[in-house]
Amino acid sequence: MGLETEKADVQLFMDDDSYSHHSGLEYADPEKFADSGQDRDPHRLNSHLKLGFEDVIAEPVTTHSFDKVWICSHALFEISKYVMYKFLTVFLAIPLAFIAGILFATLSCLHIWILMPFVKTCLMVLPSVQTIWKSVTDVIIAPLCTSVGRSFSSVSLQLSQD
């Protein structure tokens, strides 16, 4: 119990060669990915998901568990994270990809065939609507506002302090 003086040898056998004992998976450089296979996150959308054991469980300097407990909990954390991710992707990846594909196809279709023609039609009609609106404001609203303004301009207030 206490501060570790020896370096513990922990080995986890996984099919990923990029496993790190420090913080979960180590992400290789893009050049290394290009040679070894397909880069599944080329735009680094999920770079914030580099979550390791030390990010979740941490013991302060004043209180440490037994070294073997710390090593076993670290190994169990990494194994359970790896296995649960694989298990969840087996059951959720295909249905969620299917739903996302339907959603994006629907949104693309609506944007291409409904929204953009509507916007273009509005932009074509707007110059004539603008001309009609300018005529209505010049004929009806401008004289009304002018007469109300003249009526209120003749009102004067005098304050007296008695």
From Swiss-Prot:
Post-translational modification: Phosphorylated on serine and tyrosine residues. CAV1 promotes phosphorylation on Ser-23 which then targets the complex to the plasma membrane, lipid rafts and caveolae. Phosphorylation on Ser-36 appears to modulate mitosis in endothelial cells. Phosphorylation on both Tyr-19 and Tyr-27 is required for insulin-induced 'Ser-727' phosphorylation of STAT3 and its activation. Phosphorylation on Tyr-19 is required for insulin-induced phosphorylation of MAPK1 and DNA binding of STAT3. Tyrosine phosphorylation is induced by both EGF and insulin (By. similarity).
Positions carrying Phosphoserine: 20, 23, 36
A GO term, aspect molecular function: protein heterodimerization activity
A single cellular component GO annotation: focal adhesion
A Pfam family annotated for this UniProt entry: Caveolin
InterPro entries associated with the record: Caveolin (IPR001612), Caveolin_CS (IPR018361)
Intramembrane segments: 87-107
List of residues that carry Phosphotyrosine: 19, 27
Assigned keywords, A-Z: Cell membrane, Cytoplasm, Golgi apparatus, Membrane, Nucleus, Phosphoprotein
Protein origin, superkingdom: Eukaryota
PROSITE patterns cross-referenced by the UniProt entry: CAVEOLIN (PS01210)
GO biological process assignments: basement membrane organization; caveola assembly; endoplasmic reticulum organization; endothelial cell proliferation; insulin receptor signaling pathway; mitochondrion organization; negative regulation of endothelial cell proliferation; negative regulation of skeletal muscle cell proliferation
Subcellular localization, as worded in the UniProt entry: Nucleus; Cytoplasm; Golgi apparatus membrane; Cell membrane
PANTHER family (UniProt xref): CAVEOLIN, CAVEOLIN-2
Subunit description: Monomer or homodimer. Interacts with CAV1; the interaction forms a stable heterooligomeric complex that is required for targeting to lipid rafts and for caveolae formation. Tyrosine phosphorylated forms do not form heterooligomers with the Tyr-19-phosphorylated form existing as a monomer or dimer, and the Tyr-27-form as a monomer only. Interacts (tyrosine phosphorylated form) with the SH2 domain-containing proteins, RASA1, NCK1 and SRC. Interacts (tyrosine phosphorylated form) with INSR, the interaction (Tyr-27-phosphorylated form) is increased on insulin stimulation.
Function according to Swiss-Prot or TrEMBL: May act as a scaffolding protein within caveolar membranes. Interacts directly with G-protein alpha subunits and can functionally regulate their activity. Acts as an accessory protein in conjunction with CAV1 in targeting to lipid rafts and driving caveolae formation. The Ser-36 phosphorylated form has a role in modulating mitosis in endothelial cells. Positive regulator of cellular mitogenesis of the MAPK signaling pathway. Required for the insulin-stimulated nuclear translocation and activation of MAPK1 and STAT3, and the subsequent regulation of cell cycle progression.
UniProt similarity note: Belongs to the caveolin family.
UniProt protein name: Caveolin-2
Gene for this chain: CAV2
